[in-house]
Amino acid sequence: MPDMLAAACKSNQTNTEYDLVDLGGDDLSKVVSLVGTDGFMKLDKSKIPNSSRVKAESANAAEFCQPYRGTTVVLAYNSQNVTEVPTTAEELYQWIKDHPGRFAYNVPGTGGAGDSFVRTTVYNCIDDQEAMTSDDPKWMDQWDEGFAKLVELHPYMYKSGGSIVYPNKNQGALDLLSQGEIDMCPMWADMLLSQRAAGTVPAYIKMATIQPSFTGSVQSMLIPNFGSNPDGA
C-alpha cells in the first residue's frame, strides 16, 4: 500500500480509488518518507465525531491522520512446548540461545513485528529511555551494542535446509509458529487474536508480554488528495 500511494502521488494522479486509507505506523512512516504529507488532506477534527476522545497520537503527519486504535507486539508461543515463558528481554535472549532454531522474527522491512523485535533489542541496550521515543539522530551513535546483540542471536534463529532463515512478513512468522516449525516469535497482538478466533491459528498458540515491552503502533485513517470522493471520505 505505501508504494502504491506514493506512486499515485508522484505521478500526479487524480480521481483514484484511494478515497480513504487505513495505515499502521510503519506504513505511514514509509509514505511520509517517500512523498511527505503532500499527498494527503489536512483533517478538520471538528467534523470527525468523537475524535476528541481518542487519546492516541500519530508520531507522523498528525494533522493529516485520525488514529482510531493502537496495537502492540507480544511474544507469541506454543504453550504445548514452552512451559516457562520469558518475562524479560534478557530471559528471552537466553531462551533463544537455549533453544536453537525454535525462534524466528520476520525480516524487519516486511512487517512490524520483526521491526519491533529489532528496534526494541537495539534500544534496550541504551540506558536512557528517552532514546526509544526520540527522533534525535544523536542516538545513532549508541546503536552498536544493540546490533551486536542481534548478531550474537543470529546463529540461534530458525533454520531451513541447514541455513538461517528470516521469514517474510508477519504472516510468515505466524505460519511457522502455527505449523510447529518454531515455538516462539514476536507478533502483533490483534493479528494473533483475530486468527486464533477464526481458527487458522491453534488455540494453544498463546501470547505474553515482556519487560521492557516491544514497541507498538497506532492505526490511522487518512484522506489522499488524489481520491475520487474526498467529501464522502
Predicted regions and their residues:
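Extracytoplasmic ligand-binding site segments that recognize negatively charged/polar headgroups
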Residues: P2, E17-D19, G24-G172
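Extracellular/periplasmic catalytic domains that process cell-envelope and extracellular macromolecules
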Residues: Q13-T16, N60, Q66-R69, I96-D98, ...
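Extracytoplasmic/periplasmic substrate-recognition and gating elements
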Residues: M187, M191, A198-A233
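Oxyanion-binding "anion nests"
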Residues: K169-R196
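A residue-level structural signature of the nucleotidyltransferase/glycosyltransferase Rossmann-like core
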Residues: D19, V74, D183-M184, S213
